[in-house]
Each structure stands twice: as C-alpha cells, then as structure tokens.
Amino acid sequence: MIKIPKIGFVSLGCPKNLVDSERIITKLKAEGYDLVDSYDNADMVIVNTCGFLNSAIDESLEVIGEAIAENGKVLVTGCLGNKADLIKEKHPEVLSITGPQDYENLIEAVHTHAPIFANDFVSLVPPQGIKLTPRHYSYLKISEGCNNTCTFCIIPDIRGKLKSRSIDNIMKEAEKLKNAGVKELLVISQDTSAYGVDIKYKSGIWNNKEYQSNIIDLATALGDLDMWTRLHYVYPYPHVDKIVPLMAQGKILPYLDVSLQHSSPEVLKRMKRPAHTQKTLDRINKWRDICPDITISSTFIVGFPGETEADFKHLLDFAEKAQLDRVGCFKYSEVEGAKANQFDNLIFVATGILHTQDIKPEKSLKELSADKFIELFKANTIFPALVAKHFIPKLVKDTNLYSQLFLRVLVVSLIINLVVLIINFLLITFR
C-alpha cells in the first residue's frame, strides 16, 4: 500500500495570509496530501508566517521553534520568509524558506521532503478550493501588494506593488463560493479602493456583461450575486462615494471598513497617509445622508513618533464628530524596516512632551493615550451596527478591541421573525 504523506499546517497573521494558506492547502489536497491537525501525526509541518509587526515576528519564530521541537521537519513560508537569514539564525533546522505567494517553490520543497506518488486528486477538491473559514462566509482577495508608502508599514517591501486580479477572474471565484453555499463575501486586499489601478481597469466579461476592473464595477457585479458582500481595507478616496448608493439599494452590505489611522494633519503627513481630515468628515456625513443605515469602522494608531498633545486632541475631536460605529485603537509599535523608525520618537503626556526614555515602564504614555481614546469610544460605539434591516442588536465582546469595550452586532433576521411569530401566537392563545 502506498503511504500518503500527512502535512501539518499553521497559518498566522491577517486574512490575506489566511487566503494564501487556503490556496496552498488546496494545491496540496489536489496532489493527494493529507492534512492533519497535530504535530505528532504529521510527516512534515508548514508554517505560514506573519512578518509585519515585531510582535508578529516573535510569534512566528516561536511557532517555528514549537513545530521543530514537536515534529522536526518544518517548511516556512509567508511574510517572514523574506527574512530568511533571521529564520536560519534562530532555527537552522528549518528545511525550506519561501516568501509570500511563492507557491511554486513551496510545493517543490514539499515534494522534496515529503514525496508523493504522482497522481491527480483534483476531483477530490471542491470547486471553490479548501476554505479555512466557517462554511457561511469566505474571504475574497482581489489583489496582492500595495502602492502606498506609509512610513509605519513595510507591506510593499514584503508583498510588492499592487497586483490586481481581473474582474472576470474574481467573479468566477465568487460564483463558485456561492454555489458551495457561502452566504457572505468579505472583500479584502491591502488597499481595496485602489483595485484595478495597476491593470488600467481592464475590461472583463462575466455573465454576458462587460465590467471594468475597478471597485465600483466589482461591487456592482458582486451585488448581482444575491449574497452579503462586505468591503474591508477601504481608503476614503472620492470614488468610494459611488459605492454607497449600492448599499442604499441593498445590493451590498451597508458596511465600510475605512483605513484612517489618525486625523491630525501633521501626524498624517508623517505617516504619508492619503487623507484630508475635513474632507473625510464631509465624506462620512455624505455617506450617511445617502445610506442612513451604513456602518463605518476604522482603526487608529496612537503614540506615533512625533505625536503631540495637540495632535491627540485633534484625534479625539475627530472621533466625536465622526461618531464611528466600530473602532480598533492600537499603540504604535516599531516595525523593522519602517521609515517611521527614523523619526524623533516623541509622545505626549498631559503636562507636555517627553521622550520615550522618560516613560515609566509600568504605564507607558502610549498606553495612556490609547486608554483615553478607547474611553471616548465607549460612549459612542454602543449603536446597532446595521448590515441589513430588521435585525436585533446584541452586545458581544469584540476580540479586535480592548477587552472592556463592547459593541452591538446583529443577529440574522430569521430570529426576529421567530420572535414575532411567538409573540403573535401567545397573543392569539391568551386573548
């Protein structure tokens, strides 16, 4: 009997990395490899790493070490794969190191260290590929890389410049996901609103209609699938205004995950972020005028090098005016290779500006500013995050935010219909 190699797989990092893991696993399954959920039963382990924040690098190195200790045969891929010298220095036992989206060389390494009898098992793989998300939703990655040059970020160095997929290619994948029973699509990329810029918005045919490879046509086409479509990682560019009417019409979910990071013009300038605070506020108000049910989420960085008390107050004032429905607030963390590391590392306290070396370790100024920002949002985020009409708001803990912060999310409309049915039954019964 031919032994089929068993592969253990660890996926770290963001949703974009998870999609990479899905593609790798789909390829392995198509070749007949078994996937197992423990180190002990695996002939080899693949670790798909994250290499963005220093904390993510530490976690990736720790997991690689754990896999080596528990199994011994380890292949490393993903964002940290671009720092092969660092991995080899820490873990010389690693068998192979490949970077993000380097699927061909990774699979070749798998063949080398866990060879399999040549065969074609494509028929055993579902048309939509192997998915690591729950069955009801799936990530839909529309591009790789990024053209922005934010000073706190090294994504372009890790994943390269923007590389958009053609719109017909994306729609074919979306259709396969729908046919597989997926109800919700989470559209992701590094910069969703820049989709198609690099391929000059080239046209594609789907469902006998011509569409351009831009975010507006893509949202329109996805809206015709009769699925929930949610847009993530959107920059507040002017053309995003054209997407909001689709939300008002019920074509896609009235939800925008908008990358803001800060509001102070000085901080944004140092971050090299393409944003103008007043225009952003005007745009948010315009979106709400067009689609009153829209839910807007964002993330912010506090304690960025050079941030002053005035800058932080500007951010608090912006938060009060914007009244965002959902926020993630993060303390600035140095990223190896980021240009922001060269800035004067100044952050404020209520009494003035101090250098980080003057901060008491038990309560850093970054934590103070983050705590203050979160306190403001505690009063402003307990609102129904409407993604469709007739939903019941329910309080849940959101692991993406501070543990003390609770947000309202929505329970599917079937529940409210059930409640109404029960109430009507009781009224009729006891009338």
Curated annotation (Swiss-Prot):
Q: What is its EC number?
A: 2.8.4.4
Q: Supply the enzyme class, top level.
A: transferase
Q: Does the keyword Glycosyltransferase apply?
A: no
Record field: catalytic activity: L-aspartate(89)-[ribosomal protein uS12]-hydrogen + (sulfur carrier)-SH + AH2 + 2 S-adenosyl-L-methionine = 3-methylsulfanyl-L-aspartate(89)-[ribosomal protein uS12]-hydrogen + (sulfur carrier)-H + 5'-deoxyadenosine + L-methionine + A + S-adenosyl-L-homocysteine + 2 H(+)
**One of the protein's GO biological processes:** tRNA modification
Tell me where in or outside the cell this protein is found. Answer: Cytoplasm
Tell me the residue numbers annotated for binding [4Fe-4S] cluster 2.
Answer: C146, C150, C153
Its domain of life?
Bacteria
- What keywords sit in the KW lines? 4Fe-4S, Cytoplasm, Iron, Iron-sulfur, Metal-binding, S-adenosyl-L-methionine, Transferase
Q: Name one GO molecular function term.
A: protein methylthiotransferase activity
- GO CC terms for this protein? cytosol
Where along this sequence does the record place binding of [4Fe-4S] cluster 1? C14, C50, C79
User: Per the annotation, which location comes first and is thus the protein's main one?
Assistant: cytoplasm
Q: Which cofactor does it need?
A: [4Fe-4S] cluster
Cofactor: bound how, per the entry note?
Binds 2 [4Fe-4S] clusters. One cluster is coordinated with 3 cysteines and an exchangeable S-adenosyl-L-methionine.
Task: Describe the family membership recorded for this protein in Swiss-Prot or TrEMBL.
Answer: Belongs to the methylthiotransferase family. RimO subfamily.
Q: Which PANTHER family match?
A: RIBOSOMAL PROTEIN S12 METHYLTHIOTRANSFERASE RIMO (PTHR43837), RIBOSOMAL PROTEIN US12 METHYLTHIOTRANSFERASE RIMO (PTHR43837:SF1)
Q: What is its biological role?
A: Catalyzes the methylthiolation of an aspartic acid residue of ribosomal protein uS12.
State the name under which the record lists this protein.
Ribosomal protein uS12 methylthiotransferase RimO
Q: Which organism is it from?
A: Francisella tularensis subsp. holarctica (strain FTNF002-00 / FTA)
The gene coding this protein: rimO
